[in-house]
Amino acid sequence: NQYDIIICDYSLGKGKNGQQILEELRFTQSLKHRAIYILVTAEATRSMVFGALEYKPDDYLTKPFTPVLLQNRLDNLILEKQFFEKVYEALDNGHYEAAAEHAAVLVNQNRRYRVASLKLQGQALLQSQQFELARQLYHEAMEHRRQEWACIGCARALIGLQKWSSAIHVLSELIDHGTENLQVFDCLAEAELALGRNGVAQAILERATVSSPYGILRQINLAEVASANNDYLAAEKAFRRVIKLGINSCHDSHEHSLG
């Protein structure tokens, strides 16, 4: 079944939690871009928030909240979904080039959604593997103001172009400026691995898993990199976390127990 709005509590008793449901919906591509997913939780710890936001819910509400707050958030999200309807429809159908074209048309139509339009255009260009066009878009956005989302997008485009050192330069600058965005660490580790600097990549992933210990895919990546580095103590520690996080997760695998 397809739903327009999903409001899901993090704590659902036995079985999956709200984050794992969103994780599986993203992984199986069962959640349409046009749908709204709001994650609700009573906890607001740093690691919990980081873990939840990694799977990009449309909004994140901490209890207690008022009906007025919920209504305002829903109203704003519905307006945004309607504005980007053609873009989301193209993304849902895997028509990434068309999605990029639709987003480009919308960039100057509503100042409120200008940045969101650029983000969607860049995302669609990356997904359609138009890496040079994506790099140009993000570079132009960075020239106006050095925004983090544009820097990350530029780095992802550079990785797509296999310009590893250039990507590392952009990402390292973000880290030097104190970024907490975990995409930065994931992309940086990917670039370092491509250059054969596995030890550096492992250190980057270890740092990221301290900030967000609930990200199972990153823990899996760390375990595999540590194993390749013959750092069996670190690998065992990461695999133990993976097994624990894998309970009720769509990413659970018996192979993790053998790691």
Where in this protein do the model-derived segments appear?
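Alpha-helical segment of the N-proximal tetratricopeptide repeat
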Residues: 81-127, 136
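A short, hydrophobic beta-strand element within the central beta-sheet of small alpha/beta folds
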Residues: 32-46
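Active-site beta3 strand of CheY-like receiver
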Residues: 2-13
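Flexible loop/N-cap segments at domain edges
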Residues: 132-259
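Receiver (REC) domain switch/output surface
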Residues: 70-81
